[in-house]
Amino acid sequence: MKQRTYIAIDLKSFYASVECRERGLDPLDTNLVVADESRTDKTICLAVTPSLKSYGISGRGRLFEVKQRVKEANVGRQHDAPGHRLDGTSHFFSELQANPSLAIDFIIAPPRMAYYMEYSTRIYQVYLKYIAPEDIVVYSIDEVFMDVTDYLNTYKLSAHDLAMKIILDVLETTGITATAGIGTNLFLCKVAMDIVAKHIPADKNGVRIAELDEMKFRRELWTHQPLTDFWRVGRGIAKKLEQNGMFTMGDVALCSERNEDLLYKLFGKNAELLIDHAWGWEPTTIEAIKAYRPSSNSLSSGQVLHCPYEPQKAKLVVREMTDLLVLDLVDKGLVTDQMVLTVGYDIENLTDPARRARYHGAVEKDPYGREIPKQAHGSINLDGHTSSTRKIMCAVSKLFDRIVDKNLLVRRMYVVANHVLPEADAPKKNDGAVQLDLFTDYAAEEEKQKVEDAALERERKIQAATLAIKKKYGKNAILKAMNLEEGATAKDRNAQIGGHKA
C-alpha cells in the first residue's frame, strides 16, 4: 500500500490575529485578547496573541486570570525597572522588550464570530488553489487536514515546501500566519503540529513546521508528558492511565505488549484507538472520512445560562431552544421521532446551606471537580416522525416536568432531536396492515385524521413563512411572546454564533 503524506495546518491564535489585522497591528507583536468583557471578568477568552501568552497566560483562560497575570507581571517589571518605577504603558511586545520602564497593557477585543467565519472561508479558498476539496477535511474554523500524497510529484515539492508555500500564501492574502504538522497518517501530522512544532523556533513570519513518521514518533514522543498533550487523550483517560502506572505513550505501548487486556478492561473498544496511537498508527484516511455515513443522526442545541435559573424560568428557555430546533429541522427537511433532554443543576444547590439541607439526591462532580446535584436526563418518544412545533414542544414540556427537580436551580440544558431523517424517508403511519375491530368508528377516525392533517399543513405553512422572514430580515425579525418574557434568552442568542457575539 502506498505510504501517504498528510499536512495539518492550524492558524495561529486565529481570532486574535484577525482582530489585530483589522486594527492594522502585527499579531506577533501585539498584546490582545478576544473576550466579551460585557459578560464580566469571568468570561472565557476565545483567543490570546502569542506575545501575551509569553507572560504565562493560557489561550483559553478567564478574563480575570489574564488581568491577574498581567498585574503580577507588572509587579515584576516594576521591581526590575530603573528606580523601581513604571512610567507609561504599551501593548506592543517589542516596545516592552526595549523599554523596561513601560507597564504591560493589552487590548480586549469583543468577539465577532461571523467575521471570523468570513476570514476562514477566504483562507479555505487559498487552500483550494493547491489542494482539491475531496483531499481536505475541515477540522475546525482554524484547522484543516490535507492528504497531499498525490500533489508532491505534481508540484515537484517536498511536503515541507508545499506546506510552507500554502502558509505563506495565506499570510500574504490575510496577514495571518500558521503552524503545520506533516505525518504519514492523520494522527502523526496532528501530533507533529500540536506538540513538536511548539518546541521549535518560529521563522521570521512566525511559521513553525514539524514532521513525524512512526519511528520518529516513538523515538521523540514515547517519553513526552503530559499525556493530555496528545490528540484524543483527555483528562479522564489520562487519569485512568496514570492510576494504572502509565504516564507516557511509551508506557501505553509497553502495556499493549505485556497486558493488552488491562487496556480493554479500562477503556473497552476505545482501547484499540489508544493502542494504535501509542504506536503511532492511524488507519483512517481522508477518503474514509469523506465516505463515512453515520447509521443514525441527531440534531441538538445546548446552552449554559449566565446565572442560575429557577426551574420554571429554565423551562421557558428549554421551550425556546426546542422551538428553534424544530425550525432547524424544517429548514433541513428533516423529521424526528424522539426527543432527549438533559438538564444540569447549579453548584449553588449544594453551597447554599438552606438549599443543601433540602437536597438528599445523588451527587456528581462538574469538570472543575466541584460537587453538584446529579443532572436530569430523559427521553420521550413521539407518535411517529414529525417536525411539528406543536407536537414536539408539548412532548419536551412533558419531559421537562417529568425529569427536573422543581427545588433545584438550573444552570445548563441540552435538547436533542434523535433519529432524524429526511422527511421523504420517514415511514408513513398507514404503512402496513391494520387490525380492524367492530367497536371503532372508522369514519370518525378518518375525519379526525383529516382535521389533524389540515392543522399540520397550516402549521407547516407558518413554519415556512417564519423561516423565510428570518432568512431575509434576520433571526430576530419575528419573535414569539415567550421570547419577550423575563428570563428568555432566544433574542440575545439569535445575535450570537456558538454562544458568542456574531
Annotate each predicted stretch with a short phrase.
Residues A8, A103, D229, K239-V410:
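DNA-contacting surface of Y-family translesion DNA polymerases
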Residues V18, G369-A502:
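Acidic, metal-coordinating catalytic segment for phosphate/diphosphate chemistry
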Residues T184-F187, D276-W279, V335-I347, L409-P422, ...:
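A glycine-rich phosphate-binding loop feature that marks nucleotide/adenosyl-phosphate handling sites
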Residues I209-L212, L227, L299, I380, ...:
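Short clusters of hydrophobic/aromatic residues that line enzyme substrate/ligand-binding pockets
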